[in-house]
């Protein structure tokens, strides 16, 4: 027996693994703790003879190698595979810890060796790694002692402290303190476990990722203090600068070695960016910024790249490569409308005037019943205004044959000189020559945040115009008569405003203040399938003299849409997903109402009938009234690919107010005043809305009307 034990002892003394083994933190959460003094491990190899705190170990001829974060014994001999019997395992170092017994058991549970196990160097290293991998300890030291029954292993552990607080550096991080506290509060007062700490740090990282802060990094802990305070360094990814580069047709940003100059001013571009220098990089915010740049219609392409800021490590520079599109357009064409008849149109438009995103438009329209010259200028966002206020102004000159004095089947009212008619009077059509202009300011109710998606919008402005009552030859004719050769004075009306003295001026001056508010909650502005829209407006005309009326015109509109799937003609509609975007099928309802208070010129009355009203009648052929109500129900559904269909019902009523219009032109022309129409239509999808052909009946009388237009009625 003694001989066998001697052999065992001899074999043990030649082993490489049982002098001293140290484990240090090799995780990113490590506090960089080592049991060995820093001066002792500044070299790859440390001779244990110079390590005083290990002098009691029976093996002093071994060197200590540092490999992969582990400190292991090596005497240069390849004998790590020799097996040794373990007689006893003792864990110490936990005794003074508040949760010491728990940590002792955790250390034992982490090991898969027990007294009586036969192990070698590799098995021992694996067990040491398991102890450290438990996350409860910042350091592990193992000593071996030769005993009468085998090798005694003494494992000295350095427990992590009781966690008291987790701090983020810097203190002004964007992540809410409450969110951090919610993650760690129930963890405070327990022993710090590096694995659990990592899991909770991952929750912080997930918050940054979900919010779009894709460049944010959490490093640490930078240190773990003895009193249990963990400090985490947060690098949120600050944007140092935003560089703009304009690309030419060749895709290059430089010309002759110099940066290419763009037409659009830098501040016009950067005001669309919520991302600014000094802000934290956010992928979602930057994506929204790019969408806003595209929405300006100033750019064909916008490319984004990120570069490092060499002067501020950890910060980034955003580089935007912009391809500007041509913003000047010359348009022209022929067309037909109920109000203008056959017309020719020519226009010149510039949507980026002076590089400030101003839109200017010169439009000339020559029609069968109307001629218009119009110039307009609009600024989509007044420079420096945080409310994103827009401005629009226009001036115009027009001559038109007013629809209020025409009827499709009951003739028209002709222009006459005075209340005395004769058979020699020519049958001249009424012509209104209008000269004027106006301006308006509009803004979303965003609370001063230009990037807030606001559903409400308000508008205020003024309009000015001078209206002359003439005939087609330009002669002043302020009166109108349906049958100018009859001499029936009861049928002669004043075309314009009639003052209290009973006169009939040949020219009116109209000055008005306008105000409106609207709310748009539609899911799609061009082809809505759900949501609602509301608008309310008022225009107050003020008198500027004897020929200038005072009255108020109010109008309200409300529409809403209900998504449905009643007809399943396309593949997308056959899907079980009711909200499938490939099946834009909906039932929409629209309600309109309006009234006028005060004395108005007849040509300022409400008109009903036409493509945007009750579709079974031509424009203004249903009524000329002082008040009105309209209602429409429309079912829209896809038919095949880009083709869609619609079934609708329209209704309108003047509420008996045609008699309240001065001169009663609607009554003279025997306009119905109320009516309904049923019909259907078909549309072809285009970027600005469907090209639509509608067929509508007039009170189911068998009289059908065909209308062609762009975009849905509402």
Feature roles, as predicted:
Residues 2, 6-32:
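Classical Sec-dependent N-terminal signal peptides that target proteins to the secretory pathway
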Residues 97, 116, 138, 162, ...:
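Short beta-strands and strand-coil junctions in structured, solvent-facing domains, enriched
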Residues 169, 173-181, 205, 217, ...:
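Gram-negative/organellar outer-membrane beta-barrel architecture
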Residues 328-340, 657-674:
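Small/polar, glycine/serine/threonine/aspartate-rich low-complexity segments that form flexible
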Residues 475-657, 662-664:
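C-terminal outer-membrane beta-barrel translocator/porin domains of Gram-negative envelope proteins
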